[in-house]
Each structure stands twice: as structure tokens, then as C-alpha cells.
């Protein structure tokens, strides 16, 4: 028997075509592996059956929802990770988990080749292949969409010619990737930067004006940086994301229209929906404002940005990322408490904070009676703090 190919299967156009194409062009058997990351939509059994209908000799579905939430979404929260200060890494954090399960499937099903359906213009090819190189450098990688220059038109034509069951047309050519952390939409008319997104682009969020008269106030509780409660009710990491997806999505929260710098050197336009992610990152960052010491908070802003860049760039398994996470774990020792937020009209507004670990001292901060701040010490502090600037200015005026 020829060596099997283990394919990362999404159920979409490119990977459905890839099953049939790999079988016809290489003569190898294909094992399709679909990972349930809480993407919703089609039943995963339907996806599994489609893989078999497309020619896979085996089709495996892995329920990785809790693993994804706890091992991949949670670190994104702890690092307040927003690539280019906007994108909460919806697709980027899912790829290393998919890689992990593909490697496991390759060992279990006798596969020496792993395959993905990424193009040569995107970031995901890097995320997959750097991940494979990190976890299983002995595996060969096959990338038919990239290496054989498939276009969407060619893929659609191949699907039609070979009766591949996939719901995509030239009239509706969106490329969509989604999981419980969010949803990404690209291509089609969105490639023209002046074109506004139409209603059919969105799925996770309502129009921000729909529930204009009914804002939603929510309290998110944290322990050592991890979300543990919603409105006082204990939740798992997955439950926290799912509930906030529903509630924030109903308020139109989490819609992002982004032109981002891809790893491959081009700019691309993406429409993201990440209601739960944006609420959790906002709440966590606010709690850090209350509980982290000033110099630590300042430095962590730099590491947060670097962590997001590493993950976006496909370096999930890099030594630097591992080292940064050890640092971040230390920073979270006192990040416990509750943040109250109002979700309304597409916006998130923090309006309350409480924590037993708070560094906010009311008696030092108040301007009313009971003020314990020794203002007499301020004059000397100001003199010393500004001395270098004073000396520099005096020199420059000479």
C-alpha cells in the first residue's frame, strides 16, 4: 500500500477538492482529519461524510473545543493579544492545534505525508509548515493549492466536473474560516477596499442598531487572569466564550474591518467577528490596569504585542514565545477580580472594577477629606524628576 496522506480537512472548497485531486494525481490514499473548534454551522458528521464522499479512505473528527479554549484562547487573553492592535488572532491560534492533531493522526494511521489546503499568498501555509517542522520534521508536506497554483475558479470548476459536494459559486466566493473564538471572511468584493461589507458577510453578530434600546451589562470574573465567572455564575473557559459570543454578538460587538500586514509581505483586507474574544480581552486588560504595578504593566504591553506577532507569524512553538509565557504566568498572580462592562451599539464600555488584589488606594487617590497622600513631598519629587530636562534645556538655550 502506498504511503497515506493525512489532510487537514475543513469541509470547504479547497480541502474537498484536495481529497479527490490527491487521489487522482498521486494514487495515494487520503485520511481526512476535521477538527471541531466550536465553529458551528454544519454538523461535524456531515463534514465527515463529505470527506468520504470526496474520496477519503478514512475521515476522523476530533472534538477539540475545550482544548482549544483552554490551551489556545486563554493564552490569547492572558497576553491581551491583538495583532496590529486590532485582530484577536482568530485563525492564527487554531493552526498549531490543528497541526498537533494532524501529527497524532499521521502516527496513528500510518501517514508519512501531511497536507493542507493553503494558498501561497496567505499566512496559514507558514503556520502549518513551521508547526509540522517543529513537531514532526520527518513528515513530508503536500500543499496542492499552493504548489499547483489553483485559483478559486479552477477549484470550483474541478469540484463541478467531479461532482464534489461543496456550497460555493463564482457569485458568492467568500473564503470563511471560523471557530468559537471568532470568524474571518475574505475575498470577493471585499478585496476592493472602498466596498462596504454587506449584511450577508456577518453571521456571529447582529447589526449594532438592532438592540439599541436594550444594552446588556455583564460582569466577568477572573482568577489569576483566567475567566471563571459570568454575572457571578461559574463557567469553563469554553462556556465563557460561548456566552459572551451570544450576548456581545447580539449587541453588534466584535465587528472588525481590517487591512492587515500579512507575513508574506502583502496587505490584505479581512472582516472579523469576535464578540466574545473582544469582551474577554477588554475585561482582562482592564483588570490588569487595576492589579499590575506601573513598571510591570508598561513592560507587559511590549511583551503582549510581541506574543501576538509571534503567533500571527506562525511561531507558536518558538523558544521566545515559550519564554514570554513564563514571564506572563508570573504577571498573572494577582490578576483576580471582576470587571463590569456595558455592551451596546457595537461598543464595549467598562463601568466597574473590583479586586481584592487592587493597587488602587482610595485614601491616596481621593481629593476629599480622608486624603492620606503627603502632598508636601511632591515639590521635591517634581524638582528631581525634571532636573535632567531642566539642565538640557538650559544648555540648548545658550
From Swiss-Prot:
Alphabetical keyword list: Amino-acid biosynthesis, Arginine biosynthesis, ATP-binding, Cytoplasm, Ligase, Nucleotide-binding
Cell compartments where the protein resides: Cytoplasm
Pathway membership, UniProt: Amino-acid biosynthesis; L-arginine biosynthesis; L-arginine from L-ornithine and carbamoyl phosphate: step 2/3
Primary localisation category: cytoplasm
Species the sequence originates in: Mycobacterium marinum (strain ATCC BAA-535 / M)
One example of a Gene Ontology biological process annotation: argininosuccinate metabolic process
GO cellular component annotations of the record: cytoplasm
Enzyme class per UniProt: ligase
Family as reported in the entry's similarity comment: Belongs to the argininosuccinate synthase family. Type 1 subfamily.
PROSITE patterns: ARGININOSUCCIN_SYN_1, ARGININOSUCCIN_SYN_2
Protein name per Swiss-Prot or TrEMBL: Argininosuccinate synthase
Binding site residues for L-aspartate: 119, 123-124
Assembly mode: Homotetramer.
Claim: Amino-acid biosynthesis is one of the keywords in the record: yes
Any GO molecular function: ATP binding
Ligand binding (ATP): 8-16, 117
Catalytic activity reported: L-citrulline + L-aspartate + ATP = 2-(N(omega)-L-arginino)succinate + AMP + diphosphate + H(+)
Annotated residues for binding of L-citrulline: 87, 123, 127, 175, 260, 272
Record bears the keyword Ligase: yes
Database matches in InterPro entries: Arginosuc_syn_C (IPR048268), Arginosuc_syn_N (IPR048267), Arginosuc_synth (IPR001518), Arginosuc_synth_CS (IPR018223), Arginosuc_synth_type_1_subfam (IPR023434), AS_cat/multimer_dom_body (IPR024074), Rossmann-like_a/b/a_fold (IPR014729)
The protein's Enzyme Commission number: 6.3.4.5
Amino acid at each position: 500500500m502506498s504511503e497515506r496522506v493525512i489532510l487537514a480537512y475543513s469541509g470547504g472548497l479547497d480541502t474537498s477538492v484536495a481529497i479527490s485531486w490527491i487521489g487522482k494525481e498521486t494514487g495515494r490514499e487520503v485520511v481526512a482529519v476535521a477538527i471541531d473548534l466550536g465553529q458551528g454551522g454544519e454538523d461535524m458528521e456531515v463534514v465527515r461524510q463529505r470527506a468520504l464522499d470526496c474520496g477519503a479512505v478514512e475521515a476522523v473528527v476530533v472534538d477539540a473545543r475545550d482544548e482549544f479554549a483552554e490551551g489556545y484562547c486563554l493564552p490569547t487573553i492572558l497576553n491581551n493579544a491583538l495583532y496590529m492592535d486590532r485582530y484577536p488572532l482568530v485563525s492564527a491560534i487554531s493552526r498549531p492545534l490543528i497541526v498537533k492533531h494532524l501529527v497524532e493522526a499521521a502516527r496513528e494511521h500510518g501517514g508519512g505525508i501531511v497536507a493542507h489546503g493553503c494558498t501561497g499568498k496567505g499566512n496559514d501555509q507558514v503556520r502549518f509548515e513551521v508547526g509540522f517542522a517543529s513537531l514532526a520534521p520527518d513528515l513530508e508536506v503536500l500543499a496542492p493549492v499552493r504548489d499547483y497554483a489553483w485559483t478559486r475558479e479552477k477549484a470550483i470548476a474541478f469540484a463541478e466536473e467531479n461532482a464534489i459536494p461543496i456550497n460555493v459559486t463564482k457569485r458568492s466566493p467568500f473564503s470563511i474560516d471560523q471557530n468559537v473564538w471568532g470568524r474571518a471572511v475574505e475575498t470577493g468584493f471585499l478585496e476592493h477596499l472602498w466596498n462596504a461589507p454587506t449584511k450577508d458577510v456577518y453571521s456571529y453578530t447582529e447589526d449594532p442598531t438592532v438592540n439599541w434600546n436594550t444594552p446588556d451589562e455583564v460582569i466577568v470574573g477572573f482568577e489569576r487572569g483566567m475567566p471563571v465567572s459570568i454575572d457571578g455564575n461559574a463557567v469553563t473557559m469554553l462556556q465563557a466564550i460561548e456566552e459572551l459570543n451570544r450576548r456581545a454578538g447580539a449587541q453588534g460587538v466584535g465587528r472588525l474591518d481590517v487591512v492587515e500586514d500579512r507575513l508574506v509581505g502583502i496587505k490584505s483586507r479581512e472582516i472579523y467577528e469576535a464578540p466574545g474574544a473582544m469582551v474577554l480581552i477588554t475585561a482582562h486588560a482592564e483588570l490588569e490596569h487595576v492589579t499590575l504595578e506601573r513598571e510591570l504593566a508598561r513592560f507587559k504591553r511590549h511583551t503582549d504585542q510581541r506574543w501576538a506577532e509571534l503567533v500571527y507569524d506562525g511561531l507558536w512553538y518558538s523558544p521566545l514565545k515559550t519564554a514570554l509565557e513564563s514571564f506572563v504566568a508570573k504577571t498573572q498572580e494577582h490578576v483576580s477580580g471582576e470587571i463590569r462592562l456595558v455592551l451596546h451599539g457595537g461598543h464595549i464600555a467598562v463601568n466597574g472594577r473590583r479586586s481584592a488584589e487592587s493597587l488602587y488606594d482610595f485614601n491616596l487617590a481621593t481629593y476629599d477629606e480622608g486624603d492620606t497622600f503627603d502632598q508636601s513631598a511632591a515639590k521635591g519629587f517634581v524638582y528631581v524628576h525634571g532636573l535632567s530636562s531642566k539642565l538640557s534645556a538650559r544648555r540648548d538655550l545658550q
